[in-house]
Amino acid sequence: MKLSVGSYDNSTTVDNEAEILADFQQRSQQAYQCGENIMTFCYGESPRERIDWFISAARKMGTIIFIHGGYWQSCNKEDFAFITAGPLARGFDVMLVEYTLAPQTTLTEIHRQIGAALDAIGRQPGLCSPVYLSGHSAGGHLAACWQAHPVADAV
């Protein structure tokens, strides 16, 4: 592990970060290629305010909302589509939420965007309950911030 005291770039602390992300992207590309029931919708006006909804062909067990990580500064929802395979096979729909990254916007605005995304998800016809809010790294932080949102049954 590389140490970078005072750095706000977590990628500098992982020796093989590029290889890990490349693996995520390759497996995620397969998820999009194999996915028959994927719907994308916007929840705001900025180009990154969008959600990919992977709809399970199996019985409806609920919905998992996933907010991607990347230290609020990198990655996108498409990098994490590989996480959909297990939940889809078990009957869960999965929604991948995108948001504008820092420094193009502030953490306050990112937080607001996630709230707007959850509001938009709550208005979607066919939303299957219960709804589980989740995320990785920065996305986990954002999920925790919004755990009391009315659309979320659990985090």
Language-model features, listed with the residues they occupy:
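Short, surface-exposed "cap/lid" segments of acyl-processing enzymes
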Residues: 57-87
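Catalytic nucleophile-loop/oxyanion-hole region of alpha/beta-hydrolase
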Residues: 75-84, 95-130
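Short, contiguous pre-domain boundary segments
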Residues: 2-6
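Active-site-proximal beta-strand/loop segments in catalytic clefts of secreted hydrolases
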Residues: 67-68, 97-100, 136
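Primarily recognizes the serine-hydrolase "nucleophile elbow" in alpha/beta-hydrolase
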Residues: 119-155
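N-terminal cap/lid segment of alpha/beta-hydrolase-fold proteins
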Residues: 7, 11-58
